[in-house]
Amino acid sequence: MDSSDDSGVIVQAVKPGFLFRSGGAPVIYREHFAPGSGNLEFLSCGEYELQPGAVMQPVAYPEEEALVYGWRGRAHAHLDGNRYELSEYDVLYIPKGRAWSLSNPGSETVRVWVTRAPAQNVHPVFYSQFAAVSKDESRIRHLKSRTVYMMFDVSEGADKLVAGYSFFDPYSRSWPPHNHTDQEEVYIFLKGRGSMEVYESPETLSFVREVNEGDAVTIPFYNYHPVFAQELPLVFIWCIAGARYWVGDKNKEFMKGTGEPITT
């Protein structure tokens, strides 16, 4: 609080300093990859971690659209004066150039994923709650031993992004293998443990990796990318950048879960 001396001159109160310990940041952003480091053309991916009570400074992506995914804890996303609750698996589309932020109103650490891709156009904000999508059969794709939830589908406005979640039963796998000539992807593993392959052809297959919670795998154009669940159910984000479709909606053979590898 300011005060004045006998001459009427305003004397500014001196404020105390604060000590911020190394490693004690209330908001942390981890950039997992950009297009160059992921061998991609479009996608970038990162993760926010907010301690209880933390508030993130607003950020904007001047040349990119983005999707924000609730993972651990319950966050609040703030955009255009509105507040959106991000519980587990909720998704929020951030239009190109729009400033947004996160806050953590709870007592536990919050973790939130973000994927981004270049955009030329500004599309409407879209908020997708998993509690609603998981009951909407128009947004669910049932396959053998796994279920896909279309959280941000082609019906929503965007330049490049489409995204959802895949839930695998224990000891199940992607089948048939498929690749894309006009899409790149990232898989972000949220729950369970499994493995994943990324390859151009079986003859050149060398990328075989175990995947755990918090791992992300990039899938450049033309690569097959099967996933294998192990003894636990497996949940992951799939985010596409490029032509806007989901493989099972474009090629119905994929939904049968049989046959030869599929290229779209």
Language-model features, listed with the residues they occupy:
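Structural motif
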Residues: R74-H76, A99, T109, R193-S195, ...
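Asparagine-centered strand-capping/turn motif at beta-strand->loop junctions
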Residues: L102-P105, F228-A229
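Short, conserved beta-strand element in jelly-roll/cupin
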Residues: E47-L50, A60-A77, F167-D169, T181-E200, ...
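A short hydrophobic beta-strand segment most commonly corresponding to one strand
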Residues: Y93, S107-P124, T218, L232-K250
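Short, charged beta-turn/beta-strand-edge "cap" motif at the junction between a beta-strand
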Residues: R98-S101, N223-H225
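A short, N-terminal "cap"/entry segment at the start of jelly-roll beta-barrel domains
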Residues: M1-F42, Q57, S107, R111-G164, ...
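Short acidic-glycine-tyrosine-enriched beta hairpin
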Residues: G81-K96, S201-Y222
